[in-house]
């Protein structure tokens, strides 16, 4: 059996039942005793049986495709591109094509006839397309939970986003920060909501007032730079900035450089009179036109999303590696498992992240 493709008949013979019983047991249909169903599934797994995708689609009037819905701002973010590649690769292993859905509110009402299932990534409560997708009548897996009103998704793959920001805040504190700031994303996605809530709860738990600023979900480096300049000018005691949106950390570095802040340390490097090392004045104020900012009070910089922008920055930026390709693959795998009756339609799986410490927080690169 192991030298060729395992067939339904092979499973039936090994389990001592008919082909129709095997088919019903694996599809969750028909009148099959639970003990028999469990035995058939165990035998199928032991033999390495995989259903024929084409035959299964014919039996179920399947389209052979699944849909992928990304946030409207996703097209310019490296994170979502890698996530999509991972999802496509995994879907193809089950003989399924991946269809990228337009970010349109009208898509959900017609989608059930076009795809067998849906991946809805970082669903926003304010996204008009999401409710229709979640209620389209096909299995749905969300990448992070949907927090808006709906009948609810079929399943989800989630990250512990509260834990990842907690790890960043703990890290910069261990490196000497006493007044951290968080540039958290706006919006009502589970990721954005968790980061804002965690910044507040961490501050309360540690007796520290975290300077929380809200930036767009997909803030550009220029937007991050503007927000950081305003923050450090108004509150020069801030000695660590954690930037959430993908790819925006270089803007924080530019703001720090412009204001004479030495990235990678919390120690002062400026004048002994408490200036920012730019020739006098209030700490955190920009240098006079025509002058060059010298190394002033330190600033630790970190990011909630790792990627080329953080790894290639000068200095490289400490960041949370969310492993987007693996995450996309995990979402697609859960949907494939649901479509093939390998798992329950309300399954929730967790996805692991890692903290990559680099020179921007005084850590070896």
Task: Please provide the spans of the model-predicted regions.
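N-terminal helix-turn-helix DNA-binding module of bacterial transcription factors
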Residues: 1-64, 365
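Alpha-helical recognition/docking segments in bacterial nutrient-uptake
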Residues: 2-3, 65-170
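Short beta-strand segments enriched in small/hydrophobic residues
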Residues: 21-23, 58-74, 171, 179-186
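Glycine-rich phosphate-binding loop signature in dinucleotide/nucleotide-binding domains
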Residues: 47, 172-176, 231-237
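Hinge/beta->alpha junction and helix N-cap segments in small-molecule ligand-binding domains
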Residues: 71-79, 102-107, 157-167, 182-227, ...
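Short, well-structured alpha-helical segments in soluble
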Residues: 105-115, 224-236
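Flexible loop/turn connectors
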Residues: 236-237, 246-365
């Amino acid at each position: 059996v192991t030298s060729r493709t395992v067939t339904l008949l092979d499973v039936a013979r090994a389990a001592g039942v008919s082909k129709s019983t095997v088919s019903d047991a694996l599809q969750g249909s028909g009148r099959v005793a639970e003990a028999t169903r469990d035995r058939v599934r165990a035998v199928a797994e032991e033999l390495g049986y995989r259903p024929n995708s084409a035959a299964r689609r014919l039996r179920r009037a399947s389209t052979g495709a699944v849909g992928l819905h990304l946030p409207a701002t996703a097209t310019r973010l490296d994170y979502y591109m890698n996530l999509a590649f991972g999802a496509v690769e995994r879907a193809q292993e089950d003989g399924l094509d991946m269809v990228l859905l337009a970010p349109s509110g009208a898509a959900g009402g017609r989608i059930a006839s076009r795809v067998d299932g849906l991946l809805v990534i970082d669903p926003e409560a304010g996204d008009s397309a999401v409710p229709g997708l979640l209620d389209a009548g096909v299995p749905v897996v969300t990448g992070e939970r949907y927090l808006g009103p709906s009948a609810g998704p079929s399943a989800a793959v989630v990250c512990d986003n509260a834990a990842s920001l907690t790890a960043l805040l703990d890290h910069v504190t261990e490196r000497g920060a006493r007044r951290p700031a968080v540039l958290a994303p706006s919006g009502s996605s589970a990721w954005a909501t968790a980061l804002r809530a965690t910044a507040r709860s961490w501050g309360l738990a540690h007796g520290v007032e975290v300077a929380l600023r809200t930036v767009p979900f997909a803030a550009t480096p220029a937007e991050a730079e503007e927000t950081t300049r305003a923050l450090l000018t108004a509150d020069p005691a801030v000695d660590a900035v954690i930037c959430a949106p993908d790819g925006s950390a270089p803007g924080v570095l530019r703001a720090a450089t412009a204001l004479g802040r030495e990235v990678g340390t919390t120690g002062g490097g400026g004048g002994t009179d408490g200036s920012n090392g730019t020739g006098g004045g209030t700490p955190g104020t920009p240098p006079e036109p025509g002058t060059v900012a010298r190394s002033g009070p330190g600033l630790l910089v970190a990011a909630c999303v790792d990627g080329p922008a953080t790894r290639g920055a000068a200095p490289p930026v400490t960041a949370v590696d969310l492993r987007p390709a693996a995450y996309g693959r995990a979402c697609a795998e859960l949907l494939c498992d649901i479509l093939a009756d390998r798992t329950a339609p309300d399954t929730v799986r967790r996805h692991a992240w890692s903290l990559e410490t680099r020179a921007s927080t005084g850590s070896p690169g």
